[in-house]
Amino acid sequence: MRSLGYLFAVLILGIISAHGQTVSGSITGGSVVRGGSAKGAIVLSIPGGLHVNSSRPASEYAIPTTVRLSGAGVRISGPTFPRGVNRKFQFSENTINVYEGTVRFPFTVTVPTGFKGDTVRLRAVVRYQACTDEVCYPPRNKEITITARVR
């Protein structure tokens, strides 16, 4: 009975840590000049002991990380996906390209001269699959909204 409780606790902790990734984002300076561009970034923070498959994991079974950005009335360039790190895991014969720690996905937003309004709102959806060295969890989507003042 005691080992069953231990197994349950380990399972719960694994599920909690698999959902421990945070996604944030910002536009440099918090504003964009009307008729101009500004740089921004989506940031994925991955807790220790976990990794997520990169945008190009080099494995047909690994689900790649994706970032989708959208915003009404603006043009978005990017994001740019950084290179991951090749790692060898017990569950795979070949190396898999992964992200660990803090990963930045830079982008550029351009606000046209005729933009109506004083605030830009960007929607970002990050899809990733978190894994330990032994097992991968189901993929998740995290959505955030980034706002910036239009000057």
What is the predicted role of each segment?
Residues 1-5:
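Positively charged n-region of N-terminal signal peptides that target proteins for export
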Residues 6-16:
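Bacterial N-terminal signal peptides
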Residues 18-151:
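Extracellular/lumen-exposed scaffold segments
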